[in-house]
Amino acid sequence: MGQNASATKTQATYKQTLPKSRIKELFQTRALQTLSARELASIASKLNIASFNDSHVVTLTDLAYLLQLSNDKEKNVSSIHEDFACVVRILYDSLTILGNLPFLGDSLEADDNSQLTLKSLIVASAVHTGRINSFWNDAEYLKLLFISLSFPPTKQSSEKAAEKWEQVNEDSAELSFRTVPDEKDSSAQIALKIKWADFEHLTTYDDLDVECLRVPADNMVKLITLLLLVRSVRLQSHDKMQFLLQERIEKCWNKFEGAALSLVRFMNVDVNASNMNSKCITYEQFNSGVVNGFLNLFTDVFRRLFENGFLGSIVADPKAPQPLNENIEATATEKESKAAADKKQERIKKAYNFEETRLVNDASLALIATALQASGINEEISRETVVELYNGAHAGFSIRSLESKIFKWQAPTIFLISGKRLRSKTIAQNKRYQQFEDMFPRFFRSTENPRKAWQTDSDKITYAVYVEEPWRNSNKSNFGNELTTIVNLSPRYDIYTSKHDPVIKGMSVYFNNLGMGIGFGNDQPINKNNVRRIIPGKVSLTVEANLEFAVFRHIFNSSANTSAFFNFSRQEAARNEDYEDRFMITDLEVWGIGSTKELEEQKKQWEWEEKQAQARQSVNVGTLSEDRALLEMAGLIGNHGSGGSV
């Protein structure tokens, strides 16, 4: 059945050997079949193309425009921001490698000038949107992503991977079919008959050993910086989204990069700002870090870039920073809805009067939102939903002042505290600290060095605590529930969720205005008969009553009598360790989480624009014959199917 093909038939299935080039063509066709006529029309319109042939090359500028990372397809990415240009290149190379599916090993032979074709981009989009699971249901997304990011591999890993790959590299491969293909079948029909989930080059990831591969740490930092930037922009008017994203890329990159570095340190705690150009991330570190700490950051943002960007109906307009006021063929009801939306825009704009503080900005909010989502907390955290309740830099560092600012807020809050790590000299000579230490029991002996390799004198330490219940005086009993979560924001990222306990019931917080301070994860302090003693739990954050010192404690090897309100670290390197962060407080802030009304209005605006764009596209691609023409253009039906030869 065609040249260069051999076939065998068994009772269970029909098998045939085909050239790799033909298999890759059929795989691309199968990926194309996951797209709708509307999505095909959108891609064709954005690229101004008349056919979906594999010779069409996507440039770096094209890619940024297609993913809605740039609103101007004529603007060179390097003119936006130097690091942004680097990460677009990282994405470009990653998508090029995914586009080589099912033959990932071909990437080992690729040179530095490999080009991303349109069909390869469509294959990569099937991976990132999850549509590939419709014909390869065992695809491991994180493994595919890691492989794509690890090229070009380091010299050592490249040699190991290439040596193994050369042993299995052939010009043809065997495919299994559900039914015997007919000589008259088109490529589209053949692609549907193939049992892709059984194809060995897919099930073995082309025999690549991911344990030999590495991702440069600085590349990972740049990629996560971009993901956090995209995540920080909530769904709203598309033009407003473009404006905000461009503004944050140009003005806030360094802040988001700092947040990204914390996340990368969750993968590999040995990475820091000074050595990330020489450090690498292994697959084990990547998989563990993403799964335990921020899975949704990758899956949600990449899906958004492809579903709403590459495959979406909206075309960015660099000359229209504000939402368009006109629509095509709008009904009277739609016009009324648009008029109402325009009026709401004035109220929505008020949300952007948000003012940054030392601890809260778009980057830190994106990091907190990532942690809470990873903890299973369904809370919208963005500049549109948070309200500053207390800021020690403005209101003064007084527990009475703090009490007066936060006790009336009857909704969830985020308690943020930051400071400089205490040095040995301060611990030995500061009398106020020594008074606090008299109440706070030591765990480490005076002869021990309690520092871990990842802890340094220069660290800026920042923690955030999500508290769902309203604050109150709790001089006799703790309050809180099992949603209370401690998040380490810097110098590394970590999450400490509340333990499920039918007795404790998550009551892990106390606010004591009688000289015992604030505690998360502690038993009630003792304060009677001239005895003043804090009783820290296995995982706890304790704030001294004068708001001058704080201690985060994580004691894995504590006694059985020590209370456990929070789970241990989610980071592999720290989970079974005993460590503390003792620091002098420089900033303390409490932010209330407010109504999501503005977010809902913004999302409605986004949905309205999507609907209008699809309506306009329906006008342009409205007839059955035109739908068919699009599918023929993509080679999915008609005379473009290369029938007659499998």
Curated annotation (Swiss-Prot):
May be involved in a process influencing telomere capping. It is found in: Cytoplasm. PROSITE patterns: TLDC. Keywords: Cytoplasm. This is Restriction of telomere capping protein 5. The gene is RTC5. Its main location: cytoplasm. The keyword Hydrolase does not apply. Pfam families: TLD. It comes from the Eukaryota. Residues 358-594 form the TLDc domain. Belongs to the RTC5 family. GO terms for cellular component: cytoplasm. The lineage of its organism: Eukaryota, Fungi, Dikarya, Ascomycota, Saccharomycotina.
